Amino acid sequence: MSRPSEGDFGVFYRHYISLTRGNIPSELISNHAKDIVEFISGIPEEKASYAYAEGKWTIRQMLQHMMDTERIFVYRLIWIARGDGRSLPGFDENAFAAAAPASHRKLAEMKEEFLLLRRSTDLLIESLTNKELEQRGEASGYPVTVDALCYIIFGHNLHHLEVIMRLYDFT
């Protein structure tokens, strides 16, 4: 296995994949899993309701989005890894965010959920065989491999950590 290449994913995922380090999925876990978890674990409660501009997501909403999206990407990964050839639909992240109001949730509970979700995803990725990683399917109208989905999952999280650090006054 090597890093995903053009044709293994929709071009809109290129940025996510570019944020990752590693040439095989297990290297993604060793290179990124701990940093992602430590960053999320370190978000203080007083920052949870902060949004950097009117109409932008709060950190709490961002975390909910990250969890929802990871679950969707993992579902795609399992679907394709298990050989189901049917195309998977896309999703509207803003509609999902509006339908899953996070403002009532306790940040500590969200962090715990995120940590458990991340660990579950890592265990799933570690269990994949080369045959499963090579499986190809379609999601959101674009071809995607299971291998590419591993990179997309990590890259999506890294993208949002970068956004939080850059725009959410998080130091």
Predicted regions and their residues:
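Terminal targeting/low-complexity segments that flank the catalytic cores of oxidoreductases
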Residues: 1-34
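Short, contiguous alpha-helical
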Residues: 1-14, 49-93, 119-122, 134-171
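A glycine-rich, hydrophobic loop/mini-helix early in the fold
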Residues: 31-57
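Residues that form generic nucleotide/phosphate-binding pockets
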Residues: 12-15, 19, 28, 39, ...
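Amphipathic, non-membrane alpha-helical segments in soluble helical-bundle scaffolds
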Residues: 22-33, 56, 60-63, 107-111, ...
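A short, mixed-charge helix-start or loop-turn motif at secondary-structure junctions
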Residues: 18-22, 100-104, 142-146
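Acidic/histidine-rich alpha-helical segments that form the ligand environment
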Residues: 27-41, 96-134
